[in-house]
């Protein structure tokens, strides 16, 4: 209840800004770039493709740490593929939960950021995060069919950022902590997945996050 109350208090501190002067700064450039690089998760991704059920989604050139374990080596090929699906689903579930957290933070910033440019940028980023939530959820639901709950450590981190009263630290928390960590994980999975749909999906998400 305390966490919920603190989060709702953010909306009591929304900041109107009646100065609509457009400053030619980095935030304005990021907003313009976001408009130029817009994409539609429903039509720009090849959802008709489904990775073969007898092939792994993730198979890097180098051996993954768990592949050296005797317990893993004792699995049948079918069990290894099932392990791959669960392992990928767990990772992508955390992506999904993290992007929902980023969506909530960005929407808060659109309300409480003090400048006109910052509000526009936060609004555009809110749409980016909504799109990421959409495509990660659709891939998990339609292509893997497995979903994992949020990691408690990730939930704690998101709660800290969501309930902080300071808009500037909220902005830093989203850009450096949430998005910074996510970008590295997205790039890693993009590099090692054998699923062209997942690779295409991550290409667009990484492009958004790297702006």
Give, region by region, the residue ranges found by the protein language model.
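Alpha-helical transition-metal enzyme core signature, strongest for iron centers
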Residues: 95-103, 125-140, 172-186, 205-210
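Alpha-helical scaffold segments that form or flank carboxylate-/histidine-based iron centers
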Residues: 85-95, 114-131, 167-171, 196-210
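Long, hydrophobic, well-ordered secondary-structure blocks that form the structural core
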Residues: 102-163
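Long, hydrophobic/aromatic-enriched structural stretches that serve as scaffold segments
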Residues: 62-117
